[in-house]
């Protein structure tokens, strides 16, 4: 066996079908598009959701809700994630980004009570803290300051 004699396994590679290259190819002339009509033309076809003139499903459904352009989106940090920090550390948006716990501060940081906080005296200075998270941090001997 030599490098120049290597071949792909039979049936592992399929030859690309080139359309419009003569009638004997099986896909010449109309290139597999059939005869006349919208779908045979270049750029032909209907837009997504079009149902032949019948009112489309998405138009039959009622509108719901709205998107508040002034919404505040917080970077979420759970108690179990705070266990990565050393004892006595100050938890702020800057320290969390530096520790690569969060990527982006967004409108601020919110601490939630998912998971357990092992006994650590943390000083938490963030935008928002849930009531359960605040209780857990203070029970572990830490302090919470909401900015």
Curated annotation (Swiss-Prot):
Residue ranges, compositional bias (Basic and acidic residues) = 1-13
Which residue ranges does the record annotate as region Disordered? 1-57
A Gene Ontology biological process noted in the UniProt record is: translation
Q: List the Gene3D superfamilies hit by this protein, alphabetically.
A: 3.100.10.10
Question: GO: which molecular function terms?
Answer: rRNA binding; structural constituent of ribosome
May I have one GO cellular component term?
A: cytosolic large ribosomal subunit
Q: Where is the composition biased (Gly residues)?
A: 23-35, 42-52
Keywords of the record, alphabetical order, are: Ribonucleoprotein, Ribosomal protein, RNA-binding, rRNA-binding
Describe the family membership recorded for this protein in Swiss-Prot or TrEMBL: Belongs to the universal ribosomal protein uL15 family.
> Subunit structure of this entry?
Part of the 50S ribosomal subunit.
What does the record give as the function of this protein? Binds to the 23S rRNA.
PANTHER family membership: 50S RIBOSOMAL PROTEIN L15, LARGE RIBOSOMAL SUBUNIT PROTEIN UL15M
**Name of this chain's protein:** Large ribosomal subunit protein uL15
**Organismal lineage:** Bacteria, Bacillati, Bacillota, Bacilli, Lactobacillales
């Amino acid at each position: 066996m030599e490098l120049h004699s290597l071949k792909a396994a039979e049936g592992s590679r399929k030859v690309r079908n080139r359309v419009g290259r003569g009638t004997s190819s099986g896909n010449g002339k109309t290139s597999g598009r059939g005869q006349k009509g919208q779908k045979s033309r270049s750029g032909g076809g209907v837009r997504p959701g079009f149902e032949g003139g019948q009112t489309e499903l998405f138009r039959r459904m009622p509108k719901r809700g709205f998107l508040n352009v002034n919404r505040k989106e917080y970077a979420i940090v759970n108690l179990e994630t705070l266990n990565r920090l050393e004892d006595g550390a100050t938890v702020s948006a800057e320290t969390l980004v530096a520790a690569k716990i969060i990527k982006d501060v967004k409108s601020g940081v919110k601490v939630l009570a998912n998971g357990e906080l092992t006994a650590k005296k943390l000083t938490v200075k963030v935008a928002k803290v849930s009531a359960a998270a605040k209780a857990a941090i203070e029970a572990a001997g830490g302090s919470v300051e909401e900015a």
